[in-house]
Amino acid sequence: MTAAIKGKWTFRTAAVLFVISALTELVPPTAPVPLFGAMNGGAVALFYHLFYAGLYVGLGVGLWQARPWGYTLVLFTTGVYTLDRLQLLIFRKAVLTDLLSKPGPLGEVLAAVDSHLLMTVFTAATLMILLCWWGFAMYAYLRREYFSNT
């Protein structure tokens, strides 16, 4: 009888969720993305979405198949995502200004909320997501033997 591989269920579940995330990056592929204080569409947005979709598919495959490069990709993607979110936090005022200028119900609802509260919620949510990423990277580190069982 073989011993169960620790982390297999968690990593395989994460693999499926990363592939789903890759699909959501592509709908629509040119949706504007916040980079350095501006909302960028067109070719910049397409590259951004394809880059993240590629990372997420790679994570899905690497985690599902327990490849050693999957572990490396978890760490690399955590670093890239962290840098991306930090630039978003640095330029969050510009991003929120863009959100507030949107026509329709979203812009109206956001305009009715105190801007300081919006900034606080935006910052807290971004930091919480980063903590989740780093928590997953730490879990991968603690279960790194999973990636050597191929």
Give residue spans per PLM region.
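Topology signature of small-to-medium multi-pass alpha-helical membrane proteins
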Residues: 1-150
